[in-house]
């Protein structure tokens, strides 16, 4: 394979929510190849956090009005979408807002736990225009990628209002490709990429993350020949095979209780296959995981068909846990 000259990266401008980066020299054509790929990943695949649903005391749907509040619920929902935050929690987190008396309500009035940080505290939410009025609101913060419309969410209980979730922390990316001279050649590329963020991530970190995403996909293709010759299943201690797609399923898919989930995570058990490899004795040896949690795990595995139900026999059950 012919060697490809590695480019250098120069930070032209660096701020909290804006950055310009120059990548050069690139072989002819690679400016647009890299620029377009990085731009697409930056706009769609950088993880972020957003408020996904709200619940306001005395409000049952988004077309309501609130006594003593200048804005109607639809306007409040639109303003809530603009609250930008960092979430360090893997699971949904509840935050709340409680304010009494006339005045402007801003994002700074939101009461959030230590694992959630409001990045734009001066963001306007609504105005209370009566001294005896009160606004009580509960919001759910989740992590995700891209954009999740409210109408693609599962049905919520009456009173909970879904919000279009804008997870992406990168709203805008531009790139320009120019020709530069390298030795006697004048057709090499120089890539200048501009990145705007919402302040929850630095532009340089976003660029690095986007490149890592591209590397992961490219590595899968690069390893194709090696992976195609390897076995597609892993053997459990009981001698039964665990298909690769089941083995690599995240334990989040089991929808376990918070206590059980945290016990497994602290033990560095992150995949369904790891659970299936363990017998009951091994599971019970996990710190703080008791009989009740073990039974919950077994029920979830049965529910999803990973192990057979009692009385059902199969020669291909992948589980190490007996049912």
Curated annotation (Swiss-Prot):
Ranges for region Alpha C-terminal domain (alpha-CTD): 243-323
SMART domains to which the protein is assigned, alphabetical: RPOLD
GO cellular component: cytoplasm; DNA-directed RNA polymerase complex
Membrane-spanning segments: none
EC number: 2.7.7.6
Subunit-level organization: Homodimer. The RNAP catalytic core consists of 2 alpha, 1 beta, 1 beta' and 1 omega subunit. When a sigma factor is associated with the core the holoenzyme is formed, which can initiate transcription.
Protein's name in the database: DNA-directed RNA polymerase subunit alpha
Organism listed in the record: Roseiflexus castenholzii (strain DSM 13941 / HLO8)
Lineage, broadest ranks: Bacteria, Bacillati, Chloroflexota, Chloroflexia, Chloroflexales
Name of the gene: rpoA
């Amino acid at each position: 394979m012919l060697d490809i000259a590695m480019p250098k990266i120069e930070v032209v401008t660096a701020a909290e929510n804006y950055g310009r980066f120059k990548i050069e020299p690139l072989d002819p054509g690679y400016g647009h190849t890299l620029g377009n790929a990085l731009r697409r990943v930056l706009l769609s695949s950088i993880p972020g956090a957003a408020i996904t649903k709200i619940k306001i005391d005395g409000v049952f749907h988004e077309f309501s009005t609130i006594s003593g509040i200048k804005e109607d619920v639809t306007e409040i929902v639109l303003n809530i979408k603009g609250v930008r935050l960092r979430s360090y929690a893997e699971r949904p987190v509840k935050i709340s807002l409680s304010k009494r008396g006339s005045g402007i309500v801003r994002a700074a009035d939101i009461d959030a736990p230590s694992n959630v940080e409001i990045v734009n505290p001066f963001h306007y939410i609504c105005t209370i225009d009566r001294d005896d009025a009160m606004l009580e609101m509960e919001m759910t913060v989740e992590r995700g990628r891209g954009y999740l419309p409210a109408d693609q969410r599962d049905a919520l209980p009456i009173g909970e209002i879904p919000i279009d979730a804008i997870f992406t922390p990168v709203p805008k990316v531009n790139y320009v490709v120019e020709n530069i001279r390298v030795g006697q050649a004048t057709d090499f590329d120089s890539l200048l990429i501009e990145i705007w963020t919402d302040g929850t991530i630095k532009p340089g970190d976003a660029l690095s993350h986007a490149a890592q995403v591209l590397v992961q996909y490219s590595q899968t293709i690069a390893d194709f020949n090696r992976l195609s010759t390897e076995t597609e299943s892993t053997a459990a201690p009981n001698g039964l095979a665990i298909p690769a797609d089941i083995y690599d399923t995240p334990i989040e898919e089991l929808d376990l209780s918070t206590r059980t989930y945290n016990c497994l995570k602290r033990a560095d058990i992150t995949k369904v296959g790891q659970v299936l490899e363990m017998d009951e004795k091994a599971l019970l040896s996990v710190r703080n995981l008791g009989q009740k949690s073990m039974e919950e795990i077994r029920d979830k595995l049965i529910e999803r068909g990973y192990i057979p139900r009692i009385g059902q026999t199969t020669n291909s059950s992948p589980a190490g846990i007996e049912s």
